Design a protein with these regions (language model features):
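Extracellular beta-rich repeat passengers
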Residues: 1-168
């Protein structure tokens, strides 16, 4: 399938307190034959973009003013041709990137190039947590290959919660 030139506004919400949530864009096990290009998630109530497994890649994406993470993935997502991601966080927001793998068995090293993560002055976190002021969180076995990253306005660049230290 193909998803090109789509803008989703004011979407997403937490639907239960057990981290069941709806994002601006949610991709569940989407394959590499799918085209995801020129997408905008604007001022949603959860993540701008989230991948749950799959092999799809995302090109030319903007996450603007979403109230949780700008970009988030887990459950073995392994997109290999991701480029030109831009995040602007304001008001209430958490990480620019949340990178998670629940175990070593589903940590597949996605690749992302040309990332800009910008946080506006005075942006608060959902849980008022100091750690959520970081640009990138590597959670559990989260990993990947990232290049050409611009980070501005965050307290720290990464949260090293992965076993390997989570460094970029």
């Amino acid at each position: 399938g193909t998803l090109k030139y789509v803008r989703v506004e004011y979407a997403g919400q937490v639907i239960t307190q057990n981290n069941k949530e709806q994002n601006g864009f949610s991709f569940y096990s989407v394959g590499s034959g799918t085209t995801l290009e020129n997408l905008v998630s604007y001022k949603g109530n959860d993540d701008g973009f989230e991948f749950y497994g799959g092999t799809a890649s995302l090109k030319n994406a903007i996450s603007y003013g979403n109230s949780d993470d700008a970009f988030d993935w887990q459950d073995g997502w392994r997109g290999q041709d991701n480029t030109n991601w831009y995040a602007y966080q304001e008001g209430v927001a958490n990480y620019g990137l949340e990178v998670e793998a629940k175990s070593v068995n589903n940590a597949f090293w996605p690749k992302v190039t040309n990332i800009t993560l910008k946080r506006a002055a005075g942006t608060a976190t959902e849980a008022q947590s100091e750690i959520q002021l970081d640009a990138i969180q590597f959670k559990k076995e989260g990993n990947g290959e990232y290049s050409n990253i611009i980070i501005d306005g965050y307290k720290n660049q990464t949260t090293p919660t992965a076993k390997n230290g989570g460094a970029i």
